[in-house]
Amino acid sequence: DVLGSRGLGDVYKRQIMDVVYNHMYRYENVLNNTVPDYFFRQNEDGSLSNGSGCGNEFASERPMARKYMIDSLLYWAQEYHIDGFRFDLMGLYDVDTMNAARAALDALPGGRDILMYGEPWQGGGSQLHRYEANKANLAMLNERIGIFCDDTRDAIKGGCFNAREPGYAEGKPGSFWDVGGAVAAWCRSDRLPPHAPSQIVSYVSAHDNFTLWDKLLLVRYEKPEFTAADSTALAQNRLAAGIYLTSFGLPFLQAGEEFARTKKGKGNSYRSSPALNRLDWERAEKYHALVDYYRGLLALRARFPRLSSTDPHAPDALYFFSLEQPLVGWTLPAAPCDGAWWRALCVFYNPTDTSRVVPLPAGRWKLLSDGTSSSLWRGASRTYEREALLMPYSATVFGAV
């Protein structure tokens, strides 16, 4: 038994397991057959509460239901060496259960390195009448339990339920304010309760809703050609990635986003064919430059650890420039003795279709990434003083030298 003896983490890199405790397929299931009407919430008339949108919802607040959740998490972590857990519809679980699960995992050898994050929403009205593990109660969750931040997603690429609604990357007027909030992981905004930046999962696409590529094309065209290369959509894709990969928080991307994954405009593909949902590796070759762009940004981010800080006050060090709208620019000094490659970062976002000139802070700034290449930092790239040119639809990153 290769996996049982070595663990998934030895075979691959690190494995996150999607755990869907929030519902069962139907009322007649193994848990309900064990103790009828115990593991699932009921309405006042005795019918099943349906906060999952799938017919029932798991009663995490009940002692033996909570124990079932935590014991099974520990089993996966100990026997299969799972490196993290992603909780489907986490808003259907109570805060106490989630914090107890965090404490139980932390007690394992190396358990504090196990990730925990989830969807802070529900799939319908719920009978959970205590503190839900959602955005409103973020301050009550352990600082190492993260949430998918739909505020960040919608600010960058536009609302997920309206295919034609643009976001900052597509040039939506006024959205630069929300992008500033996203950069700070919403720690400097009253949009969310007090929290650590590491609790914010910064992303623009996941398995639900439109892929980033499809969304960009649906905003631009009435009848998009999803499989065709589009230079503007590629630039906007790089801009979107450049924003959330230079923001505070925990970055997340959908598999294939890095090579312009398409589901042919299908907004919710959970019932679609394997052919539509599969990863098209030919696109990885076709869009290898986009793959390289993601790879370079991830490596750049790893060399500036402050962006991944767990300190709730770390985003306070951000300084935002006063620029012509809708440009966004900011600078962030490195934390003392954190091994950063640069003394500070200076980042600009340009969501327009024209080049823009922006002033730079005092000093010499090395160009680390521009609108097309994110690996300029690896070599002897050009240094700038006083001002710099931003390409259309671009995220541009400088490092203080």
Label every model-predicted segment.
Residues 230, 234, 245-253, 257-259, ...:
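Carbohydrate-interacting/catalytic domains
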